[in-house]
Amino acid sequence: MTHKNIIVFTLFLIFNLSCFVGFSSEIIPNPDSRIFKTGDFFLSKETKINYSDNFKISAEFLKDFLMIDTNIDKYSNQINFLHKDINNDEGYILEILEKNINIYSENNKGAFYAVQTLRQLLPFQFETNKSSIREFKLPCQIIKDSPKFKYRGMHLDVSRHMFSVDFIKKYIDALAMLKFNTFHWHLTEDQGWRIEIKKYP
């Protein structure tokens, strides 16, 4: 099985398991609640991102993903990272309004998973050729979510199968988008060690 097929099979399996329990949403995993509102938010290169230092990692990730600026302009629509007690450090509220997208969470963990949900709502072109996208319309909605399981892991056996560094980076990125929080990396098998280290034989 090729590296690409492994990722495709993993995503296919997750999707079908979700369908088995009545899943009917493009958000994986299905959030605790999702309420649609009237109106749309227009995401473009002019959209600004507003955040405090507590949410810098998630905000910078989103900025790089969308390839937009982080300066505040009162005349443009905004994505705001805001603190709110959720009673779960990985929980979040994603509020998409006509003029603003508000991401509420207790800390950077919850904000990061909110960004992954927002990422899933965007067309696949954002994952590849962002430069071709001038503007995208997001329906107004409020999404609330928190993980049902504290440990959410995925395994990758590199002792029996060889993978490139680029593949492993993409694999971890896919796990993050699906809100896994643990990467179980099977590195050794008997005398085998699969990470190249120039200093040691």
What residues fall within each predicted segment?
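Sec-dependent N-terminal signal peptides
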Residues: 6-18
